[in-house]
């Protein structure tokens, strides 16, 4: 059974407060099982005061610009944030398993409250087939139980789900706006293929928001 790509957004992170931090990749933070396969997020340790400064909740994003050849690329990693008073203020500690991704064991970075992240989840782990847009379900991420509301998704050919189309089947309908069509002129309409508002085994991506 194929994985669902579950995209989780945090509606409370619209006004993020980025801050410069020093990141250290250390031995006492272990890589998480399933981390490399995208089934969970890596863990970081952060001082409670740094976490408060970032306005972070359970998740923190660390971002750097890394030189690759003749160009700079953005590297962004989302973490499960665990508080530790032993970590100095202004620092974030994470696993040495991320050295290759970041390119160094100590570096300056920008950190902020995570806006959204994606996980690969086995369909057998979460029984979402038959659920519809607006339904809630619980997903555990690194021991954190998240209450999630389904907001949309897409199938294995990229056709998006629409909340106003009943059922799980594909339909060709006249659209005036997203999802499924973005007009370039006022009043423009097009017939497009979309999925209904019910999740089937043909869905590959499920979009959700955290409900508190």
From Swiss-Prot:
Signal sequence, start to end: none
Cross-referenced InterPro entries: Ribosomal_eS6, Ribosomal_eS6_arc, Ribosomal_eS6_CS
Q: Can you supply one Gene Ontology CC term for this chain's record?
A: ribonucleoprotein complex
What Gene Ontology terms describe what this protein does at the molecular function level? structural constituent of ribosome
PROSITE patterns found in the cross-reference section: RIBOSOMAL_S6E
- Organism, scientific name: Metallosphaera sedula (strain ATCC 51363 / DSM 5348 / JCM 9185 / NBRC 15509 / TH2)
Q: Which cysteines are joined by disulfide bonds?
A: none
What are the GO BP annotations of this UniProt entry? Answer: translation
Q: Does the keyword Ribosomal protein apply?
A: yes
Q: Which UniProt keywords apply?
A: Ribonucleoprotein, Ribosomal protein
NCBIfam families in the cross-refs: PRK04290.1-1
Give the family this protein belongs to, as stated in its UniProt record. Answer: Belongs to the eukaryotic ribosomal protein eS6 family.
- Classification via Pfam families: Ribosomal_S6e (PF01092)
Q: What is this protein called?
A: Small ribosomal subunit protein eS6
Q: Does the keyword Membrane apply?
A: no
